């Protein structure tokens, strides 16, 4: 009776010690940082990759991906000459390690939909409105650089870093494309008439 009770008590105590010991360690994956929550409160300290000690059942570690992430966004805007422009923007960005805790606390894990996508929409509209539809085609690199700079200014304050910015496509309405084609045909006919 008594001996069996001591053995069972010893097994329960040993199991408890093992459970506490196993919950005292956490591992942060490569390319990630660990945000420490103590009773749900975000700590300013951010854990680097590797094995770390934590207070079992009191601290929780949230892994934030600090690798380069890709976002592709479709935007609709108007050019300076009021042409509707549909564009596709692709960018690579990452969360800076030191900003992981602040982003998790202020924005949460959905920073792409909360910060990145709206900022892209706003930057594309602001820059596109400065140029005519024709300039959007002929000055594409300059426009891309302006959009990238504006976007980087917007997202860097949150601890996000813009790596690569690309305008995948500028597309115009069928009516505008037909008008451009008609203009080119007229120019070619005029040039041909001059030569004849």
Predicted regions and their residues:
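Hydrophobic membrane-anchoring helix/hairpin
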Residues: 22-129
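Amphipathic, coiled-coil-like alpha-helical scaffolding segments used for oligomerization/assembly
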Residues: 92-93, 112-177
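Single-pass alpha-helical transmembrane signal-anchor segments
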Residues: 2-24
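Signal for well-folded cores of large energy- and translation-related assemblies
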Residues: 16, 72, 108, 152-156, ...
């Amino acid at each position: 009776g008594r001996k069996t009770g001591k053995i069972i008590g010893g097994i329960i105590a040993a199991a408890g010690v093992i459970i506490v010991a196993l919950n005292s360690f956490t591992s942060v994956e490569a390319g990630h940082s660990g945000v420490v929550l103590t009773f749900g409160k975000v700590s300013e300290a951010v854990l680097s990759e590797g094995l770390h000690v934590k207070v079992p059942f009191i601290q929780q570690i949230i892994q934030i991906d600090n690798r380069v992430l890709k976002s592709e966004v479709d935007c609709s805007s108007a050019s300076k000459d009021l042409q509707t422009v549909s564009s596709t923007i692709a960018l690579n960005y990452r969360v800076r390690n030191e900003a992981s805790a602040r982003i998790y606390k202020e924005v949460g894990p959905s920073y792409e939909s909360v910060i990145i996508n709206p900022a892209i929409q706003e930057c594309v509209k602001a820059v596109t409105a400065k140029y005519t539809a024709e300039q959007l085609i002929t000055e594409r690199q300059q426009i891309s650089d302006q959009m990238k700079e504006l976007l980087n200014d917007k997202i860097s304050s949150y601890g996000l870093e813009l790596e690569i910015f690309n305008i995948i496509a500028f597309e115009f309405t069928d009516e505008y494309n037909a008008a451009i084609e008609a203009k080119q045909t007229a120019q070619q006919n005029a040039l041909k008439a001059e030569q004849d």
